[in-house]
């Protein structure tokens, strides 16, 4: 049996109890390596330059340099690192701001260990991840009647894209072929005038039309 490659993770949180607890839990998983920890975003950036993490799990509210402001610094200096925001806040303002700055994921602090691990695995594989509580918050605000140009099926596709699903996973969830899922993805971009998956995610957040499917 082939051993799973380790995912190098950097943890950043200004609460020592949270930081130590998260580190202890993640270290129980053989395929996750907590390569470094920091109590400040700036310190985390300095450590990141040395350890070159694949995933940065970072608190959103920190002194001196906030997690949101730090996202762009990580993207500029450590382009291989994927940033996941860890927060107590489920407001669209925080979520949208994080995505606009380049976060690959957003999870709430009350999620299970399994969900944190899923987030790490998903973003390390190039996807995006938003915890179930974040979906609930997004679903609480809908666009005005007639202002949404997407069909119900397109909204389902968009919701699955935001959840980081591959074309194969989208196909399995909706009972379509992978080729059809890819066509839907391309059509969404063309219809909305968006060229990247990140742009689709921003659109979904800004318009409050994310669907939780499956």
Curated annotation (Swiss-Prot):
Q: Which organism was this protein described from?
A: Rhizobium johnstonii (strain DSM 114642 / LMG 32736 / 3841) (Rhizobium leguminosarum bv. viciae)
| Chain ranges of the HTH luxR-type domain | 143-208
Pfam families found in the cross-reference section:
GerE, Response_reg
GO function terms (MF aspect):
DNA binding
Give a short account of what the protein does. Answer: Member of the two-component regulatory system MctS/MctR, which activates mctP expression.
Q: Modified residue 4-aspartylphosphate is at which positions?
A: 59
SMART domains, alphabetized: HTH_LUXR, REC
Q: Which GO terms describe its cellular component?
A: cytoplasm
Q: Which GO terms describe its biological process?
A: phosphorelay signal transduction system; regulation of DNA-templated transcription
Instruction: Print the keywords alphabetically.
Output: Activator, Cytoplasm, DNA-binding, Phosphoprotein, Plasmid, Transcription, Transcription regulation, Two-component regulatory system
- Location within or outside the cell: Cytoplasm
Q: Which SUPFAM superfamilies match?
A: C-terminal effector domain of the bipartite response regulators, CheY-like
Residue ranges of the annotated DNA-binding region, renumbered to this chain = 167-186
Q: Which InterPro entries match?
A: CheY-like_superfamily (IPR011006), Sig_transdc_resp-reg_C-effctor (IPR016032), Sig_transdc_resp-reg_receiver (IPR001789), Tscrpt_reg_LuxR_C (IPR000792), WalR-like (IPR039420)
PANTHER family, per this entry? NITRATE_NITRITE RESPONSE REGULATOR PROTEIN NARP (PTHR43214:SF41), TWO-COMPONENT RESPONSE REGULATOR (PTHR43214)
- Major localisation: cytoplasm
Q: What is this protein called?
A: Transcriptional regulatory protein MctR
Q: What are the residue boundaries of the Response regulatory domain, all occurrences included?
A: 8-124
């Amino acid at each position: 049996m082939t051993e799973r490659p380790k995912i190098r993770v950097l943890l950043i949180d200004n609460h020592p109890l949270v930081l130590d607890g998260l580190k202890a839990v993640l270290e129980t998983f053989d395929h996750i390596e907590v390569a470094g920890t920091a109590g400040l975003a700036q310190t985390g950036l300095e450590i990141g330059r040395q350890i070159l993490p694949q995933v940065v799990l970072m608190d959103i509210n920190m002194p001196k340099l906030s997690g949101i402001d730090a996202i762009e610094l990580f993207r500029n200096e450590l382009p291989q690192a994927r940033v996941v925001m860890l927060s107590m806040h489920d407001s669209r303002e925080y979520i949208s701001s994080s995505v606009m700055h380049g976060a690959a994921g957003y999870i709430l602090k009350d999620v299970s260990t399994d969900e944190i691990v899923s987030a790490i695995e998903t973003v390390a594989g190039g996807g995006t991840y938003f915890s179930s509580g974040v979906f609930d918050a997004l679903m609480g605000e809908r666009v005005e009647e007639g202002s949404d140009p997407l069909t119900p099926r397109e909204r389902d596709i968009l919701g699955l894209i935001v959840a980081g699903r591959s074309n194969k996973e989208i196909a399995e969830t909706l009972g379509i072929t992978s080729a059809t899922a890819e066509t839907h993805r391309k059509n969404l971009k063309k219809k909305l005038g968006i060229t990247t998956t990140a742009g689709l995610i921003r659109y979904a957040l800004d318009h409050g039309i994310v669907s939780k499917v499956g």
